[in-house]
Regions:
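Short beta-strand->loop micro-motif that forms the acidic, two-metal-ion catalytic signature
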Residues: 1-9
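Active-site cofactor/cluster-binding pocket
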Residues: 169-224
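Catalytic-core segments of nucleotide cyclases and related cyclic-nucleotide turnover enzymes
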Residues: 12-23, 42-65
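Anionic-ligand anchoring segments at beta-strand to alpha-helix junctions in alpha/beta enzyme folds, i.e.
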Residues: 108, 112-182
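A structured phosphate/pyrophosphate-recognition subdomain
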Residues: 95-98, 105-119, 126-139, 219-290
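A short glycine-enriched loop-to-beta-strand structural element that forms part of the catalytic core
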Residues: 1-2, 28-54, 67-72
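Short, solvent-exposed amphipathic alpha-helical segments in soluble enzyme
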Residues: 54-55, 128-133, 160, 202-205, ...
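C-di-GMP signaling machinery
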Residues: 47, 72-108
């Protein structure tokens, strides 16, 4: 759809009120309708405007929909997106992403996992889940963690001091840069912003990067990822990883401390299952309790 600039200015002036108006449409539908809009502006050609619009609509959908995203040569602007995310019960997407992740891991000799800086329980839990997947597929695995906060210290110490784990399960950024090679895959969890990761430099050292995150897609994302699983509907990254694990390895079993890490991540991010909790959240928790 091509619109005049003056029409866009009207939409901009009323903050894309159309997004709210469409929710009032009721023709017997059980759920309220929502709208996602992507616009490309201020370019030299229609083709470039179209490309900007495609990027904008993809970004709007990745962030959960119900919003307008406008991209031009100066940057990206967001409108709307106030609707609380509702869980999708289908597991098709999780299964497809899990199978793809498995294939990428199998193709490499080593997996380096990292989350965001100043890791919380959800970040550590998701890291441990991917670590377990890599180990079950008989791959070397390491987790990048520079600063250990008090919120994850007990679990971190239990893992680091356990003889069941390698001494180099946890690496600093400097150590990770020494470990990485051409046969290394990097998996980023609980963030999709490159500068928020524990070691942004790692992202430039490998061509095989996977991203799993429950936060809305950032306008400055990890562009060279071969696999991106961004699910704003999930309560936590631990919920996503717990679900993915069930498709990567059949009848997977892992130590209690790893289950505790994943369960703690879900508990903290949902505030004891009080917020942003759906059917799949409880199913992930039940899987971990088993």
């Amino acid at each position: 759809i091509v619109i005049r600039k003056e029409s866009y200015r009207k939409f901009e002036a009323d903050k894309f009120s159309l997004l709210e108006e469409v929710k009032q449409v009721n023709i017997g539908n059980a759920r309220s309708a929502s709208l996602s809009i992507g616009l490309g502006l201020n370019t030299a050609t229609y083709a470039q405007s179209y490309n900007y619009a495609r990027v904008a609509i993809d970004l709007a959908l990745a962030r959960g929909g119900d919003q307008a995203v406008v991209k031009d040569c100066h940057g990206i602007t967001y409108f709307g997106g106030k609707k609380e995310q509702t869980s999708k019960n289908t597991r098709v997407k999780a299964r497809v992403k899990a199978e793809a992740l498995r294939e990428f891991i199998v193709a490499k000799d080593q997996v380096i996992i990292m989350g965001h800086k100043i890791a919380d329980a959800d970040c550590l839990g998701a890291c441990m889940g991917i670590y377990r997947a890599a180990k079950e597929l008989e791959k070397k695995a390491h987790i990048v963690m520079n600063e250990v906060t008090s919120s994850v210290r007990p679990l971190y110490d239990e893992i680091a001091e356990s003889p069941a784990y390698e001494k180099d399960i946890f690496l600093t950024s400097e150590q990770a840069m020494d470990y990485i090679n051409d046969n290394t895959m990097v998996v980023v969890v609980d963030t999709n912003k490159p500068q928020m990761t524990e070691c942004p430099e790692l992202l430039k050292k490998t061509k095989t990067i996977a991203v799993l995150d429950h936060h809305r897609q950032s306008s400055v994302g990890i562009e060279n990822a071969v696999l991106s699983y961004i699910e704003p509907y999930s309560s936590s990254s631990c919920e996503m990883v717990a679900e993915v694990l069930q498709y990567i390895v059949d009848d997977i079993r892992f130590p209690n401390v790893e289950a505790d890490c994943l369960y703690a991540g879900i508990m903290i991010d949902t505030q004891n299952f009080m917020n942003r909790t759906g059917v799949r959240t409880f199913e992930a928790a039940a899987f971990l309790r088993r």
